[in-house]
């Protein structure tokens, strides 16, 4: 218990959201040490087995992960992949069958009930469903955990007002949940999760019940809270768009295993596992079906006929870190294949300051007659100097 209370990661954030320590023993310590570098959460060969109707079922298999302090870490996967089990292990709602889950160096599995209570007061939790008490006002819903903890009324009021300002709901202080939109209800849930000044905020599908516009506003709020308060966020979702919008690092979970992890720009720009590619398919610039139906494959050493258009698949993964020079790319193709070069399909995006995406480019061969393998190979070599990957799709 003492180790947990003295852990350097559980820091006071009074500068951002004023919260004077109460004299009651249920409140947090008045002077907590500053945070130190290192993992906020670590999973060490974690396995979790549940008893199912057909016998033991493994929800997680030898998961090893480090979640850096002060970042936004996303966990994504299909339904039933094991995402929520990971999150429940962090706050001690589940115990690992094997391995260890450490929060700021403390093995959660070794804590007794009193230790778990102390842990959970330093971990905020935002749920998919808002779980607000309909008979209580917004302010009362936010202040309820403080009331249960024995925080004096005046101090509760100051804390609640500061949190209402933080989440943009100061005007809704005395409103009841029935009068709020879905986004406003989730803002109340976020404010309530912050009442004990947590160093770690867990979000379990926090935007999946919201419309796209409201989702973006909630993600912007989470990013702002991360910047202003410096707390670590662990976010569970099945939407790659959510990962792209707010996360620094992502782990892909498939059938209880972490199959891929890394910076968001790298995982999006160069996915290495089939599960990751499947999740990204909704964001990919796939060739439209009407165009794909007309694409013919290259026939070995046979030259392409005069008048054909060579289709190239050009990829930018973000690995170079610079801006793509599309003018140089098209000029290189024009010199080596044909004078008429144009973009057919695709798009570029910027993730964590890195440009990435896919472009389908057509190079007309009409101006220079038929093109054989040597000419096509020269065109590919020239194009690859200006992109991370260039492949031939075929011709039309």
UniProtKB/Swiss-Prot annotation:
EC numbers: 7.4.2.11
Pfam families with a match to the protein in the record: ABC_tran, NIL
Keywords per UniProt: Amino-acid transport, ATP-binding, Cell inner membrane, Cell membrane, Membrane, Nucleotide-binding, Translocase, Transport
Keyword Transport: yes
Main localisation: membrane
UniProt GO MF annotations: ABC-type D-methionine transporter activity; ATP binding; ATP hydrolysis activity
EC category: translocase
All residue ranges annotated as the ABC transporter domain in the record: 41-280
InterPro entries assigned: AAA+_ATPase (IPR003593), ABC_transporter-like_ATP-bd (IPR003439), ABC_transporter-like_CS (IPR017871), ACT-like_dom_sf (IPR045865), MetN_ABC (IPR041701), MetN_ABC_transporter-like (IPR050086), NIL_domain (IPR018449), P-loop_NTPase (IPR027417)
Topology of the protein relative to the lipid bilayer: Peripheral membrane protein
Ligand binding (ATP): 77-84
GO cellular component, one term: plasma membrane
Subcellular location: Cell inner membrane
Catalytic activity: L-methionine(out) + ATP + H2O = L-methionine(in) + ADP + phosphate + H(+); D-methionine(out) + ATP + H2O = D-methionine(in) + ADP + phosphate + H(+)
Assembly and interaction partners: The complex is composed of two ATP-binding proteins (MetN), two transmembrane proteins (MetI) and a solute-binding protein (MetQ).
Job description of the protein: Part of the ABC transporter complex MetNIQ involved in methionine import. Responsible for energy coupling to the transport system.
Similarity comment: Belongs to the ABC transporter superfamily. Methionine importer (TC 3.A.1.24) family.
Entry protein name: Methionine import ATP-binding protein MetN 2
Annotated organism of origin: Burkholderia mallei (strain ATCC 23344)
UniProt lineage: Bacteria, Pseudomonadati, Pseudomonadota, Betaproteobacteria, Burkholderiales
């Amino acid at each position: 218990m003492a180790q947990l209370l003295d852990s350097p990661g559980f820091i006071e954030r009074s500068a951002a959201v004023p919260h004077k320590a109460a004299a009651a023993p249920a409140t947090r310590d008045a002077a907590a040490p500053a945070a130190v570098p290192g993992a906020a959460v670590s999973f060490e060969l974690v396995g979790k087995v549940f008893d199912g109707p057909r016998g033991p079922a493994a929800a997680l298999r030898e998961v090893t992960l480090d979640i850096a302090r002060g970042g936004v870490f996303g966990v994504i996967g299909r339904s039933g992949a094991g995402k929520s089990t990971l999150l429940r292990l962090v706050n001690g709602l589940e115990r690992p069958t094997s391995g260890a889950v450490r929060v700021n160096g403390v093995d959660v599995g070794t804590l007794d009930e009193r230790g778990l209570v102390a842990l959970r007061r330093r971990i905020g939790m935002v749920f998919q469903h808002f779980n607000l008490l309909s008979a209580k006002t917004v302010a009362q819903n936010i202040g309820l955990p403080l009331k249960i903890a024995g925080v004096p009324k005046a101090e509760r009021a100051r804390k609640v007002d500061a949190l209402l300002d933080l989440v943009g709901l100061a005007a809704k202080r005395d409103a009841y949940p029935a009068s709020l939109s879905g986004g406003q209800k989730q803002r109340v849930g976020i404010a309530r999760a912050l009442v004990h000044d947590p160093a770690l905020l867990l979000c379990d599908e926090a935007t999946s019940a919201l419309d796209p516009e409201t989702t973006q506003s909630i993600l912007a709020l989470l990013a702002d809270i991360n910047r202003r308060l410096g707390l670590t966020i662990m976010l569970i979702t099945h939407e790659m768009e959510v990962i792209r919008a707010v996360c620094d690092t992502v782990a892909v979970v498939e059938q209880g295993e972490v199959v891929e992890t890394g910076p968001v720009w790298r995982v999006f720009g160069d996915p290495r596992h089939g599960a990751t590619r499947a999740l990204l398919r909704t964001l990919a610039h796939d060739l439209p079906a009407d165009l794909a139906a007309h694409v013919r494959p290259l026939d070995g050493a046979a030259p392409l006929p005069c008048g054909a258009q060579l289709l190239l698949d050009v990829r930018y993964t973000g690995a170079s870190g610079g801006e793509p020079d599309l003018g140089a790319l098209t000029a290189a193709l024009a010199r080596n294949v044909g004078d008429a070069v144009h973009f057919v399909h695709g798009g570029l995006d910027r993730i964590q300051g890195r440009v990435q995406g896919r472009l389908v480019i057509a190079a007309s061969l009409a101006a220079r007659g038929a093109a054989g393998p040597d000419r096509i190979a020269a065109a590919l070599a020239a194009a690859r100097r200006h992109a991370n990957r260039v492949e031939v799709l075929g011709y039309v």
